[in-house]
Amino acid sequence: MIGRITGILLEKNPPQIVVDTHGVGYEIDVPMSTFYGLPATGESLSLFTHLAIREDGHFLYGFASADERAAFRQLLKVSGIGARTALSVLSGLSVSDLAQAVALQETGRLVKIPGIGKKTAERLLLELRDKLGRALPGFGASTVPGAAAQPADSRSDILNALLALGYSDKEAQSALKAIPPETGVSDGIRQALKLLSKA
């Protein structure tokens, strides 16, 4: 199991990044919450990782904190929740917001996330109840130092990130129009997610 990766950030194409470690480029899918805090390409970073081995390949997922990875692993244990949906949940909610939603059994926050319907939200909350807190003994700690988000004037990155999260092209384009042109990619994705969650 690959539990941690430290290297140079080569590419950022949300939700996937490429990290070079001793000459090997690892493709890693990350939630938008982690993507927001990535350094600029060419700079070093360290991520907590989860390796999934399936018949169609090996897939690596990266997280800024151990808590985020623990939440991801708990989400994967919920019936009907795959890695893509788990990443969407962590892109739409912080770990603390997810824990709060689980504690209060709030389906409202979850159904705003692409790929999560009411029944899935109810099942997720039910199955995670009493589990999430135990899975996060160091809740709120263990964040990897990684640097602040860097500005990037690529509207296509914002659009691609929204499409990768499951939003339709129409929804993504609509949110994109409401964001000022000079907005950086990380801030743009964050603003778009807020706009879409209110829709």
Swiss-Prot record:
Region annotation Domain II: where it falls in the sequence: 65-143
UniProt-listed InterPro entries: DNA_helicase_Holl-junc_RuvA_I, Hlx-hairpin-Hlx_DNA-bd_motif, NA-bd_OB-fold, RuvA, RuvA_2-like, RuvA_C, RuvA_C_sf
Region (Flexible linker): 144-152
Molecular function per GO: ATP binding; four-way junction DNA binding; four-way junction helicase activity
Gene Ontology cellular-component terms listed: cytoplasm; Holliday junction helicase complex; Holliday junction resolvase complex
Cellular localisation: Cytoplasm
Domain of life of the source: Bacteria
Annotated region described as Domain I, given as residue ranges: 1-64
GO terms for biological process, alphabetical: DNA recombination; DNA repair
Keywords: Cytoplasm, DNA damage, DNA recombination, DNA repair, DNA-binding
Entries under CDD domains matching the protein: UBA_RuvA_C (cd14332)
Region annotation (Domain III) ranges: 152-199
Subunit structure: Homotetramer. Forms an RuvA(8)-RuvB(12)-Holliday junction (HJ) complex. HJ DNA is sandwiched between 2 RuvA tetramers; dsDNA enters through RuvA and exits via RuvB. An RuvB hexamer assembles on each DNA strand where it exits the tetramer. Each RuvB hexamer is contacted by two RuvA subunits (via domain III) on 2 adjacent RuvB subunits; this complex drives branch migration. In the full resolvosome a probable DNA-RuvA(4)-RuvB(12)-RuvC(2) complex forms which resolves the HJ.
Family: Belongs to the RuvA family.
NCBIfam families, A to Z: ruvA
Comment on protein domains: Has three domains with a flexible linker between the domains II and III and assumes an 'L' shape. Domain III is highly mobile and contacts RuvB.
Function comment: The RuvA-RuvB-RuvC complex processes Holliday junction (HJ) DNA during genetic recombination and DNA repair, while the RuvA-RuvB complex plays an important role in the rescue of blocked DNA replication forks via replication fork reversal (RFR). RuvA specifically binds to HJ cruciform DNA, conferring on it an open structure. The RuvB hexamer acts as an ATP-dependent pump, pulling dsDNA into and through the RuvAB complex. HJ branch migration allows RuvC to scan DNA until it finds its consensus sequence, where it cleaves and resolves the cruciform DNA.
Protein name: Holliday junction branch migration complex subunit RuvA
